[in-house]
From Swiss-Prot:
Residues 192-195 are annotated as: Aspartate. Homodimer. The gene is aspS. The keyword Amino-acid biosynthesis does not apply. GO terms for biological process: aspartyl-tRNA aminoacylation. This is Aspartate--tRNA(Asp/Asn) ligase. Aspartyl-tRNA synthetase with relaxed tRNA specificity since it is able to aspartylate not only its cognate tRNA(Asp) but also tRNA(Asn). Reaction proceeds in two steps: L-aspartate is first activated by ATP to form Asp-AMP and then transferred to the acceptor end of tRNA(Asp/Asn). SUPFAM superfamilies: Class II aaRS and biotin synthetases, Nucleic acid-binding proteins. Mg(2+) 2 binds at residues 354, 357.
Amino acid sequence: MLKDAYTADVTPERDGEEVRLAGWVHEVRDLGGIKFVLLRDRTGIVQLTLPKQKVPKETFEKVPKLTKESVIRVEGTVQANEKAPGGVEVIPQRIEVLSESDTHLPLDPTGKVDADLDTRLDARVLDLRREEPQAIFKIRNVVTTAIREFLEERGFIEVHTPKIIASATEGGTELFPVVYFERDAYLAQSPQLYKQMLMAAGFERVYEIGPIFRAEEHNTRRHLNEAISVDIEMSFIESEEDVMRVLEELLAHVFRKVREECEKELEALDRELPELETPFERITYEETLDLLSEHGIEVEWGEDLPTEAERKLGEIFEEPFFITEWPRETRPFYTMAKDDEVTTAFDLMYQGLELASGAQREHRYDVLVRQIEEQGLSPEDFRHYLEAFKYGMPPHGGWGLGLERTLMTITGAENIREVTLFPRDRKRLHP
């Protein structure tokens, strides 16, 4: 390896040790008889100090030629110094330029010069070098790891369902068509139908962390056309409460893990995460409309909640909460109904965002066919899905959790694009 340590490994306790470091030139300061280079890698920044009398002439003379963001390799000696950042510096004996950067940068990775979001996304690779994006994506890694650990401990099996499908998952029109030889095909909106088929296959508990694609024309701070969804499905449930408990306990676990493992990253983002207490509060859809009406926002029965309503609910409820018993007309055909008006469906809300949706599913073949027809769809279009219900389908339910929206609540990002490496929205297909 070209390096044997990260910058974070360089501590005063290693005074006198030889190290090999590699990273990016963050800053260069030339004071004549002494020169400084700030070397950055994914763990932080360390100061390279070059007194003219203590380093080789070749190394000393190389510093003024270094351009910001060039990639360099350094061999030197750790030296404790209370005046240096972090109380430590490295005295280089050798500096090797591995890759020289252009002097004209489309944005400043040090963050000293502000840039708008579009500029940052256009130069995303440089933008991702900044401290805040680095913190966000380290947190994202901890979040997905925590999700997997939580679900695996509870007997869930990770699966990967098709992303090229022949028909709409939910009968909607928000589909991206793809060229698939001589047939029509689409990108999957969700793994929903396949999760249910796996319940019939006897898997009992499955989860997937994977992409979903929705051809929505929304161009807001909370919408993407390609996103990552965390989905589960579980068999032999008594009611939707069984899957709601898994969801609330998972979210509390994720927040706890991020607090424990991402102290430095949260500090970089100026965030303090609360300890989520379970169970979360539950209010029905009808109660939600009444509450909104009390605050001057009128929503007709059977309508989805507009953004204004979600924001107001985020002001009323400081903690995550569930909205339950959604009207039948607002939910897909596979949702189990409680009566002629409402269903077992629920949404998880937090900070004015809908984070997750779920329900107990309809497992009875004849009822499912009827509900497909009632929504103006053809059972023939779902024949392979329906086939699974003919040979013994257990009562089951599940949910889908938006990973990016969850990360918005954790990191404080105001725009969903901030928590996505290379976002895809209505106007952005590059980089």
